[in-house]
């Protein structure tokens, strides 16, 4: 199995808009001073995906070359529930997962990021096992060793969502890692909401030590940079601009500097759009 190596330089970007064409997300990234971006490759709130045409692939790959952006991340749709107890939703999810991964391979995207799932009326244990089956069924797509890694995003712990604890993510990874390239995308707002105190350097030291012990730092492949509107452990997923929430700017400067996290691709999902992202990228690159 081919495992995508880490980048050779720090990469920083944001979730940019693919309005008017997937390639436009790359050009918006270039315009805000990014070196990588995250995007939706299809409407994130619909089951039906538009078919990827050769023209779309060509436009995207030309934009990749022209912008010199790398380690692009696709964020899978919000309707997906890899651990859904409802058989119809589970089957729809698996079809979408297959299409999403296939499109990412065609486009030359490096990461495809999924929310692990929600148990809803069922137990989390059963949800975790169904999610493992869902991701395992994607193995045939990786037979030709594409340079793509599937990422499980940390969640805030609201409702019946799985993936808010490192232990749950470790369980998923242990069940998947032999079949597909798998890793974790750590969302700073989400883990803070789930009770991991990253508001200080000392806090980060404890969290990274715990992550390494439970999952292994080699599985940490990317970071979503978001401050948090709500306080520690509230299980509420509300992003704030960098330095304007309950986590604080020192936490993000730590991520930019520490040898364990400095080279991990980082993607802003903060509210405010391109004007704010330009300022945040400049701040994180120059001030931190």
Swiss-Prot record:
Note accompanying the cofactor annotation: Binds 3 Zn(2+) ions.
Entry-linked HAMAP family: Nfo (MF_00152)
Keyword Iron: no
Taxonomic lineage of the native organism: Bacteria, Pseudomonadati, Chlamydiota, Chlamydiia, Chlamydiales
Cross-referenced PANTHER family: APURINIC-APYRIMIDINIC ENDONUCLEASE (PTHR21445:SF0), ENDONUCLEASE IV ENDODEOXYRIBONUCLEASE IV (PTHR21445)
CDD domains: AP2Ec (cd00019)
Stored Gene3D superfamilies: Divalent-metal-dependent TIM barrel enzymes
Enzyme Commission identifier(s): 3.1.21.2
Protein name: Probable endonuclease 4
Role according to the record: Endonuclease IV plays a role in DNA repair. It cleaves phosphodiester bonds at apurinic or apyrimidinic (AP) sites, generating a 3'-hydroxyl group and a 5'-terminal sugar phosphate.
GO biological process: base-excision repair
GO molecular function: deoxyribonuclease IV (phage-T4-induced) activity; DNA binding; DNA-(apurinic or apyrimidinic site) endonuclease activity; phosphoric diester hydrolase activity; zinc ion binding
Residue positions binding Zn(2+) 3: 190, 237, 239
Pfam families referenced in this protein's UniProt entry, alphabetically: AP_endonuc_2 (PF01261)
Binding site for Zn(2+) 1: 75, 115, 153
UniProt entry keywords in alphabetical sequence: DNA damage, DNA repair, Endonuclease, Hydrolase, Metal-binding, Nuclease, Zinc
Family (UniProt): Belongs to the AP endonuclease 2 family.
Domain of life where this protein originates: Bacteria
Residues annotated for Zn(2+) 2 binding in this entry: 153, 187, 224, 269
Alphabetized PROSITE patterns for the sequence: AP_NUCLEASE_F2_1, AP_NUCLEASE_F2_2, AP_NUCLEASE_F2_3, AP_NUCLEASE_F2_4
Cofactor(s) annotated in UniProt: Zn(2+)
Catalysed reactions listed for this entry: Endonucleolytic cleavage to 5'-phosphooligonucleotide end-products
InterPro entries per UniProt: AP_endonuc_2 (IPR001719), AP_endonuc_F2_Zn_BS (IPR018246), Xyl_isomerase-like_sf (IPR036237), Xyl_isomerase-like_TIM-brl (IPR013022)
